[in-house]
Amino acid sequence: MCDQQEIQCCGPIPQCCVKGSSFGPSQFPYANNQVLVEAPCEMQFLECAAPCPIQVSQTPCQSSTTEVKGQAPCKTTNVKCQTKTTQVKCQPKTTEIKCQAPCQAQVSCVQCQAPCQSQVSYVQVPQPPQTYYVECAPVYYTETRFVEYPVSNYVPVPAPQPGYTYVECPSLGQGQGQGSFSTRYQYQGSYGSCTSQSQSRGSYSSCGPQHQSQASYSYCEPQFQSRPSYTNCGTQRQSQASFGSCTSQLQSRASYSNCSSQRRSGTSFSTCAPQCQGQGTYGSFTAQRKSQSASRCLPSRRLQPSYRSCSPPRHSEPCYSSCLPSRCSSGSYNYCTPPRRSEPIYGSHCSPRGRPSGCSQRCGPKCRIEISSPCCPRQVPPQRCPVQIPPIRGRSRSCPRQPSWGVSCPDLRPCAEPHAFPRPCRPQRLDRSPESSWRRCPVPAPRPYPRPEPCPSPEPRPCPRPRPRPEPCPSPEPRPRPRPDPCPSPELRPRPRPEPCPSPEPRPRPRPDPCPSPEPRPRPCPEPCPSPEPRPCPPLRRFSEPCLYPEPCSVSKPVPCPVPCPAPHPRPVHCETPGRRPQPSPRSQPCPHPEPMPRPVPCSSPVPCGDPIHCPSPCSGHNPVPYSQELGCHESNPCRLDTEGPSSYSFSQGQESNGCCVSGGVFSGSRGLSGCGDQGNTYRGMNCGACGGTQGAYF
């Protein structure tokens, strides 16, 4: 059978019927209705091995025509009789008719297109009333063709049209991309089972796979056109999930080598990087869910631009839960405040970044100028670094310059940290940044020792825990600690500690003088009224400013108390950690230690600047800055400044004064990256130009 000899049959393509050759039934009928068919000499014949080994015989054309459908390995032949032919019936015995090859001029009625090329030979015959289809499985022979007509194989069918009827049998072996025949469309309805498909295998990897992929492709045929882009339909099916139809894939194909690869491409880009671009094109891909950075690629890319080196915004996580640039006025911050903690941001600028010790390592806090010094000379020269630090703290360059300043800072940090912690956002950074700052600056360690005493003054800062600001005001009292009376007022702040309350009497003393008006505000919380003094305490938060200038702060603070007191309260609301501040409140007892605070007094050099006064003035509400100062106050601690100041805002150079700090500085950015107390991108704050010798610090 041809299938058995498929290779042989298909092999000698040239042996197949030559295109242009024609053969037709001889005009000489033979007995038994056998017809001798003459064909061109060059024509090869196939022998059909079948139960009835009979060559197709055609009688002179009768009213009906017989069409023989021969499936041959090399070719299929369609034979139509131009004249009416009588139906040949297969007897139990079939006679064989050998086709004589002698070339006859008379043989012209049948055209045989070379099956090797077209795989189909068409025979055109005037339409007979009936057409008989005879199937014979030819076996390849060089010279003879045997056609058998089992009676059962005859299927009478009316001719489809008055024109010519074409009958094709897809040949088994040879499919050279000629897969489509004019008649093929009869079968084309679905390649459900087209043996010939194997022939067109050149075009289709396999018809079976096509069916599988048909879910995505309405037809296999489209694959022909799309084929160049698709290795095989099977693969398309896999990608099908991503694309409604692979047909569209073709367009997108340019970016993706294949559908399945696209799915894999999701790995390279959280979502396929191309998908971000093509996201409009593709509603959504299963792969997109893979995007880890963001629900959508686009935002993540935006994040990257917004934070050039802020890959570690994790430090700023408090601020950027989703790393959305909008929350942090990233535009204003080349680096998220956290980046300073994430030295990696400054890796290029600060080789020391890696090491925990050394302010240079703080370079990461580049966001905070104080840290910017050695590591980040570009942002701020080392000399600036100290200067910048005071601006953040609102104190003075002198403090940052002096390791002692750092000493005070540690204490302030403990105290201030509670303050900062109340702010949900900052506390995290505070924790981290202070730690990092400690690591970075070994100097602070010594500072803590002296500062333990100052720390009590920060404890008044815990009074700020009431940051309703009343408590912060008490912190200023610790600054006034030189004013023993104010110190008791911090105790009042711990008001839970009634014992310290006795000191409140001193507090009233400051109250009448500094803030008679503040008292009304404290009146909402009468005890907080002393807090107005604590309001100056926020300058302490600013770092050691209040500590450095406790008296100035306290003096002005009482006055500021009235206005800021109400405002701070909302901020305390933001600060959930006030409890921590109360913890320092015990330190408020150390508040008597304000004497250590005089140590900051060296830093008090800023006092002349009156910046502390400015701090209180915000506290007092004299400055529109008060809220920013509250931030400043929280940030007042040098340690916290590292964490808070920059995160909350950046200093604008525009504010510069010989007096270390001048209120009215503009901070751009939100108070806290966390969004705590975010009040817009600009904030007024202390700007230290003269102290640091720098106009301003950029975060």
Swiss-Prot record:
Give the signal sequence positions. Answer: none
Disulfide pairs?
none
Q: Which domain of life is it from?
A: Eukaryota
Which compartments is it annotated to reside in? Cytoplasm
Annotated Pro residues bias: 448-477, 513-533
Summed up, the tissue specificity of this protein is:
Expressed in the stratified squamous epithelial layers of the skin, esophagus and tongue.
Stretch list, region Disordered: 448-533
Q: Which GO terms describe its cellular component?
A: cytoplasm
Is the Cytoplasm keyword given for this protein? yes
Primary location: cytoplasm
Q: Which residues carry this modification: Phosphoserine?
A: S436
Alphabetically ordered keywords of this record: Cytoplasm, Phosphoprotein
Is Cytoplasm tagged as a keyword?
Answer: yes
Q: Which InterPro entries match?
A: Keratinocyte_PR
Q: Which PANTHER family match?
A: KERATINOCYTE PROLINE-RICH PROTEIN (PTHR48138:SF2), KERATINOCYTE PROLINE-RICH PROTEIN-RELATED (PTHR48138)
Please report the name of this protein according to its UniProt entry. Answer: Keratinocyte proline-rich protein
Species? Rattus norvegicus
